[in-house]
Amino acid sequence: QKLTGDLATGKAGLEGLTALAGATTTKLEDMFAAAGNVGNALGEVGAEFKTPEEKAKAVLEVMKGVAAFGQEGAVEISDLAKQMAKVSAAAGFFEGDRSGNLLKMTALAQLARQSGGAASATQAATSVLSFANILRTPARRAQFKEAGIDVDSATQKGQLRDPISIIKEALTKTGGAIEPMKKLFANVMGDKPVTALATAYNKAGGGDAGMKAVDAMLAKFGGTMSDSQIASNNAERMKGTAAQG
């Protein structure tokens, strides 16, 4: 937890993060750096969290989700861990639950890499930060307003609406047509997560069928890596190490 200076949280989360790093063959330093970025995004002990243990548990839950998404998507956690600063920064602009937003941004990064045209984990993470910045740029905001789409939170001043809701509304309002979508998300990097969902929407024929395809795509990124799977992966790894030794 060198990035947060939160030693107590780092100590409380050490065992869980070490096990997760082993189970996903992620370098410890990358796992801890990623967890530090997630911890920064989630909040502070004494404010959002009562104890270091409570914060450490919340950080681990997010990281287990990120690991599970790595199994479903195109970017493994060992690669994405190095990019969590960008994903965490993007998550901070949206309304609602911080943990949930981190996982939504991670899912969008996975989709950007899988079928949105992002060529690497670095590009995928950059694309979600660019996506958040699109929604904060005056020229783009004017385009959304013109299309009848409100990108601002109705309940949290200064925050953006749920990112998935914004994309879905854009697809509905434009019918998924390429030109109107490009007009809204006019950023060659930031439109990559949107492109992945728009492609699924259009392939299914748009409308209700298209939205079902979008929901099915997003549903893949709803799980977590269970404690039993982490233990099993580590046991297999230890067996392999013993056999080699």
PLM regions and their residue ranges:
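Feature targets compositionally biased, intrinsically disordered low-complexity regions
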Residues: 157, 175, 209, 221-222, ...
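Long, low-complexity, polar/charged, intrinsically disordered or flexibly structured peripheral segments
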Residues: 187-232
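Amphipathic alpha-helical interface segments used for oligomerization, scaffolding
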Residues: 2-206
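Hydrophobic, low-dielectric interface segments
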Residues: 12, 117-120, 225-245
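Short amphipathic alpha-helical surface micro-motifs
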Residues: 108-111, 178, 213, 220, ...
